[in-house]
């Protein structure tokens, strides 16, 4: 393995994959730029698909299917497309299917804006945001990969944008369309025909380092410097236990892939003298095994001081998963130590302290390793003075470690004490706040009781006023009945008096008429017949009036007609 303990040259003791670049920004035309890694640990996407290869994710695909109403980049800048004749237009399908030279000739006549729109359309398909579904990309890729006319000789005649589109369709990496990525045409051709690594941060010729192994020779586009032997994907994670390097062939494998495919298991290392079993990694490229404990120790010694909290947690998780099935003592201890440190980090332990503890643990298990058995194999007895010196060294080392542990525990005790004091101060502040809240609550309670008392008083007043209103209403109804009765009685008395008055007037008129009639009868015996008839009629009428006693409306102001005609 590239970093295993004591098994390689000093330059091989560096952190894994340190020769790789770690970001696309490192690819530059400036030859003086360093190709060393940045030391930044990035998350490995080996569990699914490599995010750096920019395959469209299932989430973006589903977003494209559920958002079919959106228009893709082909609908933008229509004023540019309108100036291109139908015969000169070129689509992605034309590039994937038509003859290379014919499409190249048509593309030379197209404006730059149209070519940029063509590239944006391919980007949108890869991202799952285009007007066409991701199935269109698979369709295009099938066309390109089944063509036999696309060779290094014919691709020389291709248009620059045409070549970029073909490379993107073939590899599925849209970074080749990025404006800041300016690879030469020969490099693009070599990537297309699998003669150069498709990882823009690597760009090594294939097979890398002239490796004659079966995988490098037969697997198209595989680069043993940056790609996983199992999944054939790459990422930019460095200084990490996410990648395992082979001690013999220096091929790399994702730790996740190795665990998933059973390439990490118990076994006896060929370099072990004691013959004891330990956790080994079996390289799929060369079938050689490499021990893992020394490799993990070297990675932590070189890289752990630079890891942040999240990175340290992930690395401890990787080591824990690697040694979960370990049956040897040191492997089990390492597994338990990683589990313990992860719990402590979750509980608030600083990452620097955790890194120191794991490094101290590696020193302890190195002292506990069966070196005495291996060094004493076939040898004679140890001299007493040498034995005493070794014992003294062991005691000194033990005392030194005890002092370090004691200092660490003292520091942790002081930190815990400070935390306790801080908690006590917080408790006191919270108690004051609780007392204030209780006082405020009591005050609010008194205010509520006062308001409730006022409400009850107002309710009593309202009930009293309602009672008085009811009594007044009853009294008003009683007075109304009295007034009505008196009014009826008054009207009856008025009508009676009025009738009596009219009756007396009628009697007076009747007497007056009788007197007049008698005078007429006594004074004019020889009157005219008509006058006699008239008097007889008046007499009959008066008799009829006396007989019938007519009722007269007391409210009427009209007089008896006899009064107006005496």
From Swiss-Prot:
InterPro entries referenced in this protein's UniProt entry, alphabetically: OBE1-like_PHD, OBERON, Oberon-like_PHD, Oberon_cc, Znf_PHD
Tissue: Expressed in roots, seedlings, stems, leaves, flowers and siliques, especially in the vasculature.
One Pfam entry name: PHD_Oberon
Main location: nucleus
Zinc finger PHD-type: from-to: 225-289
One BP annotation, GO: maintenance of shoot apical meristem identity
GO CC field: heterochromatin; nucleoplasm; nucleus; plastid
Region (Disordered): 1-79, 545-566
Disruption phenotype: No visible phenotype. When associated with OBE2 disruption, plants exhibit premature termination of the shoot meristem and impaired root apical meristem establishment, leading to a diminutive phenotype characterized by an absence of roots and defective development of the vasculature.
Name recorded for this polypeptide: Protein OBERON 1
Organism from which the protein derives: Arabidopsis thaliana
